[in-house]
Amino acid sequence: MTLEEIKTTVLYIQGLQALWKEDYNAEKIGDYTFGIVCRDYNTTDELWEVINELQFMGEGEEWEKTKEEVETLIQEKLGIRICDPISILSYTINLFIKQLTSDFSTNSLVLSFIEQTKELITYQEYTLALENLLKSLLEKYIFIPRDTLAILDNIEDTQIQRLQASLWRV
């Protein structure tokens, strides 16, 4: 998955979450989704399947989906719970860890940091887990590939952003 695909997925879900707060409106969801199509973002196959199913909502009864159907579709295709604000954070951190594991598959020190992080994630401590992982990487001056580190651009936590900025300089 490319960085642009990750950012598109996060942007799309954040937009849907904002629409959810206004109350469920199929036509608005269809319009918003169609706007994403018009911008020609790079998407994953899974996100494209979601977009294809939702872009015509509000255009007629045959395209309509209930709130629950949309939530289920997104959960099944993307693994993101639209009503759960922590879901995007979880999604982003899990992608970062997956890519980091791939980048450092032979580095036992980094892999041990990742295992410690996974233990905290088990307890839903996403921000703390990521913060600890980034601090450990920074303390050991471990260079993280730019594309991998950029996955975290979507996280809006000041401490995480500071640690990420410090890791850019390693």
Task: Identify what each model region corresponds to.
Residues 5, 28, 35, 73, ...:
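Generic short N-terminal amphipathic or hydrophobic helices
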Residues 21-40, 104-119:
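A short, compositionally biased N-terminal segment around positions ~18-40 that is enriched
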Residues 5, 42, 121-125:
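Structural motif
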Residues 25-67:
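Acidic, low-complexity, intrinsically disordered interaction modules
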Residues 3-25, 32, 102-103:
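N-terminal acidic leader/helix
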Residues 55-58, 63, 67-170:
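C-terminal-biased regions
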